[in-house]
Amino acid sequence: METKAIFLDVDGTLVSFDTHRVPQSAIEALQQVHESDIKIIIATGRAFTDLHELEEIPYDAVIALNGSDCVLRDGTPISRKQIPEKDFQRVLVLAQHYGFALAIETNKGIFVNELNPTVIELARLVNHPTPPVADIEKEFMGGECCQLCIYCDEEMEKEVMAQLPGLSVSRWNPFFADVNVAGVNKAMGIN
């Protein structure tokens, strides 16, 4: 039997940047889709543990962290592509050199090396708590990190990423970008 599925993004698609909620009409439509034996799969840059706004949606699986962490709704892992330590260490050096804030997304949460107005504004934009400042090297070593976040403009991003051939970048905001293992993206997660 052929499986049918729909794939949906979260921020700016299911969840409005204005209301920070999923419209009731979308919830009802997706409940009908699910009742028709069509799988609902969330494809997002967010972590699997950061989907509280979607509790009423009967999704089946999540392609989280831009394809780096694919899990069933109950948390059963399907695949996970972690940032290699050598690449993380290089990004950490570049963050210090260029002076941009750096966040890591691990199985223990999101942590930043510094708070600045951009970090605070982006947390507000997606209605998240501001990530705590931590020793991100220690947090990286003590957890499973599948995504980094660099808080810089596109010009600096190009300069930084030219020095990181093992990583790739995706951007949905002019002052922030997600960084994953090269070749990892939502399309790979779908496959």
Where are these regions (language model features)?
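Flexible loop residues that form catalytic
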Residues: 11, 67, 153
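Short, flexible loop segments at the rims of nucleotide/cofactor-binding pockets, characterized by
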Residues: 17-20, 40-41, 80-81, 125-128
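Conserved acidic, metal-coordinating active-site core of Asp-based
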Residues: 98-101, 105-191
